[in-house]
């Protein structure tokens, strides 16, 4: 892996911290330094621009990263001082946790020495539990500063179930963030190995790469060997919440034979991942036996991996989905560690032909029912959504979700707005993501150019994250989120003043912006030129606008001088 600190840095940027009500609440931000504006009358300084920062300690000059040691436990003191958790031995790691059986063992030895925490008997340790009792936790204050919003609003939104702060007590390394319609639209990046490709180092590097470009959460969707070890390395080194789909690992434990899945194996997998520090689980508890026939005449059937696994299990056993029948027990586990549940849309449409159909909305009704059960346990909930939806059908998805799930945060995969662009589905889906985000969706799951084609690599992760940062920011602008437009205004001003380096540095992808500019005008002098290669020096509209403004100012001065003479050379009448 290349030097972490070097590839995590952004140009003309520095890490700054805003301190809260206590010294250990230090909220990170990235401050972008701007060059001054040069005018005919002198120099005007431009204030630096502070932006939301997901890069964690990796961009702090005082921090020396070591993947073998992980990140410092930022939240550990906050967790322990509440007095409602206890340390315990935890379950031993088994060969099948890493995909091995028949006596074989993983050759990977984990370097992290830690014992897991859990709630003391009779205690609930979720942020929702505290919020309902009127407590503003350090985590809530942290996100309030990050979002430039009052901490009491954060508490109210979490208490009402309209926002979640994913924060497993066994992932103290994560910096608190919030998912809800009143806050910045967040994005998730999926990573993870498969049975045919990738390694632990590659997945850790993908995680770092994703948070460098702005991913707010990570989902580890590993399905190959070393699942447990891969996840441990990712969590210990992740400054953002980590989610998983536990049914994937449970299926690996039975060698991929769906019929052999049991509640006991799934429950053991939940506890295994809870002890590691997974912050939210996608659980496909809404795929009910009676809904499966509704998918038979679909163009693309059931496209969710988790949904198809549970549908196959239900049909094989002629029984109801065990995730549904054991949901109360699942909530008992979740509230013991403060793991949020992301209620999976196992029957989401996989083509625009199937959008908003009977199966999709039948499952949504069940997710609404499960939301209320989770809230009864003070478990934080978000609802997963589609998928593939043409633009004119997007609003109906949001309206139904808000009504049925009582305002629980909506978390959507796109949606893709057309099916004809394999290789460009980061674009087809970012269109839908911007629209659904503007309507109130709280988090957008990115789609990479490799969607439907293969496992994304590091470059695909970058493309997907940037596409979705654009969509999320566009949605923030549409929602009128406080301060969202400041970066746009700063970049527009830099563009009009031909401050090329400031334009690059204020952009979501400074490297790409600089690279494209320098393909045709690489000389350093071009960074102050009043034109680019698109129009050249004679046809640049902004250069012409400057000349027009200068002319108007000069004409205005001439007019004022004329009025001065006509008024008897008196300043006052």
Swiss-Prot record:
Pfam family, one: ThiC_Rad_SAM
Gene3D superfamilies: 6.10.250.620, Radical SAM ThiC family, central domain
Residue sites binding [4Fe-4S] cluster per the record: 532, 535, 540
Residues at which Zn(2+) binds: 388, 452
Cofactor remark from the record: Binds 1 [4Fe-4S] cluster per subunit. The cluster is coordinated with 3 cysteines and an exchangeable S-adenosyl-L-methionine.
E.C. no: 4.1.99.17
Cofactor: [4Fe-4S] cluster
GO MF annotation, one: carbon-carbon lyase activity
GO terms for biological process, alphabetical: thiamine biosynthetic process; thiamine diphosphate biosynthetic process
Family classification: Belongs to the ThiC family.
Protein name (Swiss-Prot/TrEMBL): Phosphomethylpyrimidine synthase
């Amino acid at each position: 892996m290349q030097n972490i600190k070097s590839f995590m840095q952004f140009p003309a940027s520095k890490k700054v911290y805003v301190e809260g009500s206590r010294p250990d609440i230090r909220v990170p931000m990235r401050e972008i330094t701007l060059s001054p504006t040069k005018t005919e009358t002198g120099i005007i300084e431009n204030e630096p621009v502070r932006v939301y920062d997901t890069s964690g300690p990796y961009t702090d000059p005082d921090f020396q990263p070591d993947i073998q040691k992980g990140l410092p436990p930022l939240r550990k003191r906050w967790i322990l001082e509440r007095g409602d958790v206890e340390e315990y031995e935890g379950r031993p790691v088994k060969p099948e946790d890493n995909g091995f059986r028949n006596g074989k063992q993983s050759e990977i030895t984990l370097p992290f020495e830690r014992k897991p925490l859990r709630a003391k008997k009779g205690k609930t340790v979720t942020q929702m539990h505290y919020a309902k009792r009127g407590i503003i936790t350090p985590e809530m204050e942290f996100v309030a500063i990050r979002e430039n919003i009052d901490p009491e609003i954060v508490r109210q939104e979490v208490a009402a179930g309209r926002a979640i702060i994913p924060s497993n007590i066994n992932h103290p390394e994560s910096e608190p963030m919030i998912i809800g319609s009143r806050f910045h639209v967040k994005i998730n990046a999926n990573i993870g190995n498969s049975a045919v490709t990738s390694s632990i180092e590659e997945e850790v590097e993908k995680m770092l790469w994703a948070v460098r470009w702005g991913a707010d959460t990570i989902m580890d969707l590993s399905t190959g060997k070393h699942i447990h070890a891969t996840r441990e390395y990712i969590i210990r080194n992740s400054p953002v919440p980590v989610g998983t789909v536990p049914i994937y690992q449970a299926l690996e434990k039975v060698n991929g034979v769906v019929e052999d899945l049991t509640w006991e194996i799934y429950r053991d997998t939940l506890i295994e991942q809870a002890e590691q520090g997974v912050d939210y689980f996608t659980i496909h508890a809404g795929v009910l036996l009676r809904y499966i026939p509704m998918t038979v005449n679909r163009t693309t059937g059931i496209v969710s991996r988790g949904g198809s696994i549970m549908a196959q299990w239900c049909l094989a056993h002629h029984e109801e989905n065990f995730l549904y029948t054991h949901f109360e027990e699942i909530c008992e586990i979740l509230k013991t560690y403060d793991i949020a549940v992301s209620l999976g849309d196992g029957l989401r449409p996989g083509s625009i032909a199937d959008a908003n159909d009977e199966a999709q909305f039948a499952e949504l009704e069940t997710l609404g029912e499960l939301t209320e059960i989770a809230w009864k346990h003070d478990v934080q909930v978000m609802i997963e959504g589609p998928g593939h939806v043409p633009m004119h059908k997007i609003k109906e998805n949001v309206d139904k979700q808000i009504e049925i799930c009582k305002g629980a945060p909506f978390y959507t995969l796109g949606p893709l707005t057309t099916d004809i662009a394999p290789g460009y589905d980061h674009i087809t889906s970012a269109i839908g993501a911007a629209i659904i985000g503007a309507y109130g969706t709280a988090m957008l799951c990115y789609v990479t150019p490799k969607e439907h084609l293969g496992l994304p690599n590091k470059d695909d992760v970058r493309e997907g994250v940037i596409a979705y940062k654009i969509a999320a920011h566009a949605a923030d602008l549409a929602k009128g989120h406080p301060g969202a437009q400041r970066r746009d205004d700063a970049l527009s001003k830099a563009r009009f003043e031909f401050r090329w380096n400031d334009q690059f540095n204020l952009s979501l992808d400074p490297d790409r912006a600089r690279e494209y500019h320098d393909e045709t005008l690489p000389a350093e002098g071009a960074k102050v030129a009043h034109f680019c290669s698109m129009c050249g020096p004679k046809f640049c509209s902004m250069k012409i606008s400057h000349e027009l403004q200068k002319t108007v100012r000069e004409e205005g001065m001439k007019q004022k001088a004329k009025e001065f003479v006509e008024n008897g050379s008196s300043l006052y009448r």
